[in-house]
Amino acid sequence: MKKYLIFGATGGIGSKLANQLYEEKKDCHLIGRNEEELKKLANKLNYSFTVCDVLKIDFAKKLVEDLSDTDVIGIAYCVGSIEIKPFKITKARDFVSSYVLNLVAVTDIIRSLLDNLKKNNASVVLFSTVAAKKGFTNHSIISSAKSAVEGLTVSLAAELAPNIRINCIAPSLTKSKMA
């Protein structure tokens, strides 16, 4: 069965995307860590889902098992964070946590599903922020992590073409809880 995967499916962007793809009669598999919200959305849209936290070691292994009979035709990695604070009070762990969530986890996902993605000429959409290029005050944590996402995007787009398309969207403020 051909499906799109939406990571962060219960967030503002992820849930909006899930609803839009439902309206377009596309099949999706929703991924998120909030089990109650994920079940509610999946039941409403009649989508399959996996409760998983991308910050947990071996999360990708469980996901690949859940998707063993699925042809993945697209991934939307709508997971993210925004920690805004003056640089002088940041800690190394702030940067590491943001890099793991925004960059490292998605590399585990893509690597784990690489053969599946290639076979299906899939598309991967990652998210950055305008802060990665604009230099906003107190955005050093998120802008550096999302700049890394943009670097990964152009590198993987070159490396994985023509079988897998990798793109990155860098929105400004959105109408969501996180914003």
What residue spans do the PLM features occupy?
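Active-site loop-to-helix junction immediately N-terminal to the catalytic Tyr of the SDR YXXXK motif
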Residues: 90, 135-143, 155
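Residue(s) in the substrate-gating loop at a strand-loop-helix junction
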Residues: 129
